[in-house]
Amino acid sequence: MQKESIYGLTREQLVDWFLAHGEKKFRATQVWEWLYTKRVASFSEMSNISKSLMTLLEENFSLNPLKQVIVQEAQDGTVKYLFELPDKNMIETVLMRQEYGLSVCVTTQVGCNIGCTFCASGLLKKQRDLTAGEIVAQIMWVQHYFDERGLDERVSHVVVMGIGEPFDNYANVMNFLRTINDDKGLAIGARHITVSTSGLVPKIREFADSGLQVNLAISLHAPNNEVRTSIMRINRSFPIEKLMAAIDEYIEKTNRRVTFEYIMLSQVNDRPEHAQQLADLLRNKKKLSYVNLIPYNPVSEHDQYSRSSKEAVLKFYDVLKKNGINCVIRKEHGTDIDAACGQLRSKQMKKEKVKNQ
């Protein structure tokens, strides 16, 4: 049976586990420091803990459960990792070099059931949720890469926007957030972490009550129900009116800005009237709204879509700006590698299938 990754425990949970096994609280603190401050690669490197405690840890936990399968490096410094999990499932993680630091995009599920018609992540249906440990391990793998090479760089920003719907794996994602945000561990600031959801309304409300200062992003991608339902199946369950009501509640409770992700699809959602509808939709919350216009990365399986022209994107941007909406055209990363989320995994799974036939 596969042992749980110790990365899956928050500091509080680690302390509770130690106390339940007859160990002192300060031992848990020592182990936590070895994991996240000294960032060791094995329990045997924890030089100030007893042999019996080391054995106890080795019997109950694994450290990093990921196995690297493929690494793609782009000319702009973006690195895309394909990892194999202990059950042979595969996930993707992306490192992006930004002006403000190193940002990592993590995956939260093996596959995705949300079924957005433009997305490579949903080409392979959800097999299971990732554990909190498997999500934390993605950050640790990237950080170890820099540590091992003596590079004085650290992961400073995290976006929970990889394969899967984070709020469909809510409990594990929340434990992941608490672990990486812990000031005695990786200490990645809450305001440097963004969680994206396609619009699971009950979980948006729950997230508003969580007390975490983590940023929220909404994968909106359309300004009206007709267009959104045609490209995002989730809109049937949670139409725009319900989604916006939940966001209004979130803003009222947290007073935090919400980012709206908007993939630009040629002749689908990119016309000036769509931009005006979006501006009207956000008018009552424009002080705490931020629109991220995203150039579409074409996916061969979704050839009904193509990216909007630069002219269409700029016109859309101008309409939003004239309406007082804060917006930006997202800078592209890794365009010379499998840039679309889920693309690398999908390609590799196809290769494996052919190989095994």
Swiss-Prot record:
<feature type="binding site">
    <location>
        <position position="119"/>
    </location>
    <ligand>
        <name>[4Fe-4S] cluster</name>
    </ligand>
</feature>
<dbReference type="GO" id="GO:0002935">
    <property type="term" value="F:tRNA (adenine(37)-C2)-methyltransferase activity"/>
</dbReference>
<keyword id="KW-0411">Iron-sulfur</keyword>
<comment type="similarity">
    <text>Belongs to the radical SAM superfamily. RlmN family.</text>
</comment>
<feature type="binding site">
    <location>
        <position position="116"/>
    </location>
    <ligand>
        <name>[4Fe-4S] cluster</name>
    </ligand>
</feature>
<dbReference type="GO" id="GO:0000049">
    <property type="term" value="F:tRNA binding"/>
</dbReference>
<dbReference type="Pfam" id="PF04055">
    <property type="entry name" value="Radical_SAM"/>
</dbReference>
<feature type="active site" description="Proton acceptor">
    <location>
        <position position="92"/>
    </location>
</feature>
<keyword id="KW-0819">tRNA processing</keyword>
<keyword id="KW-0489">Methyltransferase</keyword>
<dbReference type="InterPro" id="IPR007197">
    <property type="entry name" value="rSAM"/>
</dbReference>
<keyword id="KW-0408">Iron</keyword>
<comment type="function">
    <text>Specifically methylates position 2 of adenine 2503 in 23S rRNA and position 2 of adenine 37 in tRNAs.</text>
</comment>
<dbReference type="GO" id="GO:0019843">
    <property type="term" value="F:rRNA binding"/>
</dbReference>
<keyword id="KW-0479">Metal-binding</keyword>
<feature type="binding site">
    <location>
        <position position="112"/>
    </location>
    <ligand>
        <name>[4Fe-4S] cluster</name>
    </ligand>
</feature>
<dbReference type="InterPro" id="IPR027492">
    <property type="entry name" value="RNA_MTrfase_RlmN"/>
</dbReference>
<keyword id="KW-0949">S-adenosyl-L-methionine</keyword>
<keyword id="KW-1015">Disulfide bond</keyword>
<dbReference type="GO" id="GO:0070040">
    <property type="term" value="F:rRNA (adenine(2503)-C2-)-methyltransferase activity"/>
</dbReference>
<feature type="domain" description="Radical SAM core">
    <location>
        <begin position="98"/>
        <end position="330"/>
    </location>
</feature>
<dbReference type="GO" id="GO:0005737">
    <property type="term" value="C:cytoplasm"/>
</dbReference>
<feature type="binding site">
    <location>
        <position position="196"/>
    </location>
    <ligand>
        <name>S-adenosyl-L-methionine</name>
    </ligand>
</feature>
<dbReference type="GO" id="GO:0030488">
    <property type="term" value="P:tRNA methylation"/>
</dbReference>
<feature type="active site" description="S-methylcysteine intermediate">
    <location>
        <position position="341"/>
    </location>
</feature>
<dbReference type="InterPro" id="IPR040072">
    <property type="entry name" value="Methyltransferase_A"/>
</dbReference>
<dbReference type="GO" id="GO:0046872">
    <property type="term" value="F:metal ion binding"/>
</dbReference>
<keyword id="KW-0004">4Fe-4S</keyword>
<feature type="binding site">
    <location>
        <begin position="219"/>
        <end position="221"/>
    </location>
    <ligand>
        <name>S-adenosyl-L-methionine</name>
    </ligand>
</feature>
<dbReference type="GO" id="GO:0051539">
    <property type="term" value="F:4 iron, 4 sulfur cluster binding"/>
</dbReference>
<feature type="binding site">
    <location>
        <position position="297"/>
    </location>
    <ligand>
        <name>S-adenosyl-L-methionine</name>
    </ligand>
</feature>
<dbReference type="Pfam" id="PF21016">
    <property type="entry name" value="RlmN_N"/>
</dbReference>
<dbReference type="GO" id="GO:0070475">
    <property type="term" value="P:rRNA base methylation"/>
</dbReference>
<keyword id="KW-0808">Transferase</keyword>
<dbReference type="InterPro" id="IPR048641">
    <property type="entry name" value="RlmN_N"/>
</dbReference>
<keyword id="KW-0698">rRNA processing</keyword>
<keyword id="KW-0963">Cytoplasm</keyword>
<dbReference type="InterPro" id="IPR004383">
    <property type="entry name" value="rRNA_lsu_MTrfase_RlmN/Cfr"/>
</dbReference>
<feature type="disulfide bond" description="(transient)">
    <location>
        <begin position="105"/>
        <end position="341"/>
    </location>
</feature>
<feature type="binding site">
    <location>
        <begin position="164"/>
        <end position="165"/>
    </location>
    <ligand>
        <name>S-adenosyl-L-methionine</name>
    </ligand>
</feature>
<dbReference type="InterPro" id="IPR013785">
    <property type="entry name" value="Aldolase_TIM"/>
</dbReference>
<protein>
    <recommendedName>
        <fullName>Probable dual-specificity RNA methyltransferase RlmN</fullName>
        <ecNumber>2.1.1.192</ecNumber>
    </recommendedName>
</protein>
